[in-house]
Amino acid sequence: MRIALGADHAGYLLKVAVAKHLANHGHDVIDHGTDSEESVDYPPYCAAVGRSVVSGDAEFGIVLGGSGQGEAIAANKVRGIRAALCENEYTARLAREHNNANVLSLGGRILAPIFALAIVDVFLSATFQGGRHTRRLAQITDIEEEECL
């Protein structure tokens, strides 16, 4: 799989760990930065990840920050992105199975790397269940289309 990554300074170290983990598991990583712990604003990195996913350059994206909240919000501004902030394996699984999330948001100041990597693995291995969730996603897409006119 091709996975796009983007982080601000607070998510940088966790991004490095996630990138290494993904590469060790045979995934291709597209790294949109940042490249240090020097303070930066997160929205451009999250938008770049979202655009990689929407364009098809990446199958999924992962954005990382201090809490992951702002990163999820920023990524969700890209039309077609369904970013989910996940702090455990259960929410990561449901984000994919029920919401067909295509971007995972993680908090570098919230999660120890060992837990974050487990969340990444669950997120990437879970699949959308369809069924009643398809109808709900269509409703979300309708809202997105109306708001983006």
Residue locations for each model-derived region?
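Alpha-helical segments flanking ligand/cofactor-binding loops in enzyme cores
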Residues: 20, 47, 51, 73, ...
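Glycine-rich phosphate/diphosphate-binding loop of Rossmann-like nucleotide-binding domains
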Residues: 4-24
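C-terminal binding/interaction regions
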Residues: 2-6, 10, 89-149
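Residues that form or flank phosphate/diphosphate-binding pockets in enzymes
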Residues: 13-14, 40, 70, 114
